[in-house]
């Protein structure tokens, strides 16, 4: 019986059977070696006198140890197993029982043999194919004199090309030829006697027979023969091929299953934007298609394929990276990046916790190694300029130098994002890093583009705030934010404005306040719980039971009231509140302090009566009051020039006629409140800026000077209060360079401070006071239009000699303040006395002045050359000083009512009202 027939028949086993056998036995033994202690693994068939062990380490290939009675043979690796073993070593000693079994089986086979040797009793489905294999093998065996297990399986391999005869995993005729040791050719002779069978064949048939009986098979199948050969470590090259192939398949499956584990460091310090896009957790990206296409084009390069997004804060640099992740998730990208994954690396998280030198470098190297092994990662670095200084210390290198080699070779695909200033400050200084990034400029969105972006985000914000946005509200958010929020950029500021308007409307329409009945029940429940605990502590369980029942009843009542209120609110919840254009205007008014909401009826009446309100504090000067009122009305109704301040006025006139007082009255009445007029007015005394070096204090000191970085006194105040009155008092005393600085403010409504920030003056009312020509006004004073025209021409000529033409040409109006008449001074005296009476009333003293005393004050305080300031000094001397002496002497106490009068000598007389003569 030629044993090659057995091998040829054994190779007939189909692939699934071999895969099952390998998985149950060899794979488990070999691949489990590196993961656990050496373990004895049972062969897939019941093998006698044979065990299989595996030993392995983390870095070396697992090894097999075959045990055959007293012989121990170590197989160091999978490759070339058959070359290190000989048949003599691999053949176990045949027991007497095995010999008898073999002789019986061989006799049966010989009795059924035909002219050409064949084994007809194979398992159905394989017998015919095995018979053909034996016939093919006979031709090969005729060249050999000894029948063993090392003859090539040529007969079987000729049948492998058909579908029903698929080869064993990885087994080809070439491999078999290479793995089989050649036997020298002998004269053509086919051994038929049993003596010519080798001991390997005898033992293999015996084991196959035993296994067939063990599993209740009536015949010996090819599966039994093959597993018998492998279990006896005969035909070891078949086991080598099967295990190598299965090991590769298993490693591939493990690699796929542990792909996420291999990105452990990257996932610890990063965020998978592609996964978030697949889950729908990213906001939709509207527009920016041109910039995204440019990024994809750079990513498709072979080397230096690293785009760097450069733009101002808030223009949408991060949104472009998220948009790319969304396109990859939906597959709407070229095939060059279809399988890529966008991961955002958090540099702050990467740097956190690096206590010792080298920890940051180790994290970065692990990240780069994971990216290199994966090969499908696009790394997004927001604020990429932090790479330049991250980790830099004495004796260490920064993160940028670690990234540079990978960026240049194309091993790392990175999308950076930074601002224009940071790019110039950090990236451009490092020429080696700059050449590895390809800049992509991200401009600020236009108003129309911003409206489209807001419409794309509308659904997300409606779901969050439970409101509805009208198209007019979105347009207003884009336009108003672009117009009134100057220190930020679109679309970020428009999105924030839309978000804030939604939150305002939601809170305004919220009906979550509990009713009074619910509050009373909750208070009673709290009291009941306390009494129950006290009863339990003193072991009064009867009382505790009663309180517990009362507690349950209270909870039921509270729940019923709450559910009823929820049901009543359900119809309102369906009809969600609507965010309108006026809601957006209210939101930006809260944000900037500029009144942009529509003019209400109350405010309309307030604007129409603005002159009357101002005249309560400012006596006379009708022209100035009217000019200021007209400017306020234009600005409030949106009719003023959008690129200039509300108004730029010069109040010219003699001292003490109410120039500064008018600005204060305007700030108190319209821009602020009467209690705090200073909060709505930016006042600068220009006498403090007489020196040339003091001019820089208006906008901030330049680098290298004291107070650099503190902000300018003018620019910083307007940045904090953009809707205010800017009063430049006694402007003619300032240095001439101050007027050059104000040219840009008067014409364009903007000014750049010492830190490079642009300050918006478009919502300010600029008032400058001057005393130029005051002596001429006093000397040429008089009544009538002729005198007023003569004074105006005189003052205008004087101002032309003092100020430059470009400064005067940018002023809206120069208003002349006339000297005060005695009648106007009397009215001012009444205002001052009423103001003093209000201060004394806070001390508990009721004050009343007579007409005689008022005339005395006007007589001593009137001076046409000095205006109303002498009047204030007269009030202080005649009234305040006299009343203070009486209070110190005890003649006037808290709660008294006093009357102030004047005697015939022109002195003030203070007496209590109950001491007055009848």
Swiss-Prot record:
The keyword Repeat applies. GO terms for molecular function: ATP binding; ATP hydrolysis activity. Pfam families: AAA (PF00004), AAA_2 (PF07724), AAA_lid_9 (PF17871), ClpB_D2-small (PF10431). The keyword Chloroplast applies. Residues 266-515 are annotated as: I. CDD domains: AAA (cd00009), RecA-like_ClpB_Hsp104-like (cd19499). Residues 579-774 are annotated as: II. GO terms for cellular component: chloroplast. ATP binds at residues 311-318, 653-660. Keywords: ATP-binding, Chaperone, Chloroplast, Nucleotide-binding, Plastid, Repeat, Transit peptide. It comes from the Eukaryota. It is found in: Plastid, Chloroplast. Its main location: plastid. Belongs to the ClpA/ClpB family. ClpC subfamily. Molecular chaperone that may interact with a ClpP-like protease involved in degradation of denatured proteins in the chloroplast. This is Chaperone protein ClpC4, chloroplastic. It comes from Oryza sativa subsp. japonica (Rice).
């Amino acid at each position: 019986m030629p044993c090659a027939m057995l091998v040829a028949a054994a190779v007939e086993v189909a692939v699934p059977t071999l895969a099952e056998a390998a998985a149950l036995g060899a794979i488990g033994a070999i691949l489990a070696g590196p993961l656990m202690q050496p373990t004895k693994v049972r062969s897939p068939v019941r093998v006698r006198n044979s065990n299989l062990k595996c030993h392995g380490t983390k870095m070396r290939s697992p090894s097999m140890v075959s045990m055959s009675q007293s012989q121990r043979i170590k197989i160091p690796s999978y490759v070339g197993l058959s070359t290190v073993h000989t048949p003599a070593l691999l053949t176990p000693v045949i027991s007497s029982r095995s010999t008898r079994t073999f002789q019986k089986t061989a006799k049966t086979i010989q009795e059924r043999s035909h002219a050409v040797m064949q084994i007809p009793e194979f398992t159905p489905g394989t017998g015919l194919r095995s018979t053909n294999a034996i016939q093919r093998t006979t031709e090969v065996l005729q060249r050999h004199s000894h029948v063993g297990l090392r003859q090539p399986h040529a007969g079987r391999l000729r049948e492998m090309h058909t579908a029903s005869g698929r080869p064993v995993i990885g087994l080809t005729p070439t491999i078999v030829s290479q793995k089989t040791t050649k036997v020298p050719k002998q004269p053509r002779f086919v051994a038929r006697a049993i003596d010519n069978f080798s001991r390997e064949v005898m033992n293999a048939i015996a084991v196959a027979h035993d296994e067939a009986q063990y599993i209740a098979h009536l015949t010996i199948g090819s599966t039994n023969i093959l597993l018998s050969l492998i279990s006896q470590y005969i035909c070891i090259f078949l086991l080598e091929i099967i295990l190598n192939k299965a090991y590769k398949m298993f490693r591939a499956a493990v690699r796929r299953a542990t792909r996420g584990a291999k990105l452990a460091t990257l996932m610890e310090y990063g965020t998978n934007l592609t996964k978030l896009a697949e889950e729908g957790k990213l906001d939709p990206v509207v527009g920016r298609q041109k910039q995204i296409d440019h990024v994809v084009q750079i990513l498709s390069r072979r080397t230096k394929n690293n785009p760097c997004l450069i733009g101002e804060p808030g223009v949408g640099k991060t949104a472009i990276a998220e948009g790319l992740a969304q396109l990859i998730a939906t597959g709407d990208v070229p095939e060059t990046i279809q399988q890529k994954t966008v991961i955002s690396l958090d540099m702050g998280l990467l740097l956190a916790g690096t206590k010792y030198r080298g920890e940051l470098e180790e994290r970065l190297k692990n990240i780069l190694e994971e990216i290199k092994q994966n090969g499908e990662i696009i790394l997004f670095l927001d604020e990429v300029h932090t790479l330049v200084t991250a980790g830099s210390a004495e004796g260490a290198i920064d993160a940028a130098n670690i990234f540079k080699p990978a960026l240049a070779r194309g091993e790392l695909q990175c999308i950076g994002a930074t601002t224009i200033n940071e790019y110039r400050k950090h990236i451009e200084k490092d020429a080696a890093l700059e050449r590895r990034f390809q800049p992509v400029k991200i401009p600020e969105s236009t108003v129309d583009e911003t409206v489209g972006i807001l419409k794309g985000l509308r659904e997300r914000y409606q779901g969050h705030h439970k409101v509805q946005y009208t198209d007019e509200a979105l347009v207003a958010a884009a336009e108003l934010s672009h117009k009134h929020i100057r220190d930020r950029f679109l679309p970020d500021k428009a999105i924030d404005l839309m978000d804030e308007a939604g939150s305002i409307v939601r809170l305004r329409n919220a009906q979550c306040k509990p009713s009074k009945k619910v509050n009373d029940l909750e208070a009673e429940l709290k009291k009941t719980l306390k009494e129950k605990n006290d009863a339990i502590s003193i072991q009064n369980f009867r009382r505790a039971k009663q309180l517990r029942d009362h507690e349950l009843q209270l909870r039921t009542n509270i729940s019923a009231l709450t559910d009823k209120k929820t049901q009543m609110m359900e119809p309102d919840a369906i009809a969600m509140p609507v965010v309108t254009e006026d809601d957006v205007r209210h939101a930006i008014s809260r944000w900037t302090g500029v009144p942009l909401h529509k003019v209400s009826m109350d405010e309309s009446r307030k604007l129409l009566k603005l002159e009357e309100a101002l005249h309560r504090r400012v006596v006379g000067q009708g022209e100035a009051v009217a000019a200021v009122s007209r400017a306020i009305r234009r600005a409030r109704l949106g009719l003023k020039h959008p690129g200039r301040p509300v108004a730029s006025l010069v109040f010219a006139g003699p001292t003490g006629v109410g120039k500064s007082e008018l600005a204060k009255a305007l700030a108190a009445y319209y821009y602020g409140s009467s209690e705090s007029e200073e909060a709505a007015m930016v006042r600068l005394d220009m006498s403090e800026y007489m020196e040339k070096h003091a001019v820089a204090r208006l906008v901030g000191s330049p680098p290298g000077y004291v107070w650099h970085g503190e902000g300018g006194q003018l620019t910083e105040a307007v940045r904090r209060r953009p809707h205010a009155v800017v009063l430049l008092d006694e402007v003619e005393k300032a240095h001439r360079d101050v007027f050059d600085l104000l040219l840009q403010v008067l014409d364009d409504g903007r000014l750049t401070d010492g830190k490079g920030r642009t300050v918006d003056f478009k919502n300010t009312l600029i008032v400058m006071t001057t005393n130029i020509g005051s002596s001429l006004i006093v000397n040429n004073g008089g009544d009538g239009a002729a005198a007023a025209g003569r004074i105006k021409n005189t003052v205008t000529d004087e101002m032309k000699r003092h100020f430059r033409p470009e400064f005067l040409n940018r002023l809206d109006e120069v208003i002349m303040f006339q000297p005060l008449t005695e009648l106007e001074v009397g009215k001012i005296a009444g205002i001052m006395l009423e103001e003093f009476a209000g201060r004394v009333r806070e001390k508990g003293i009721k004050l009343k002045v007579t007409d005689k005393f008022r005339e005395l004050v006007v007589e001593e305080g009137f001076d046409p050359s000095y205006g109303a300031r002498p009047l204030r000094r007269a009030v202080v001397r005649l009234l305040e000083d006299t009343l203070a002496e009486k209070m110190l002497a005890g003649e006037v106490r808290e709660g008294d009512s006093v009357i102030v009068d004047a005697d015939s000598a022109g002195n003030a007389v203070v007496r209590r009202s109950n001491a007055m003569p009848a």
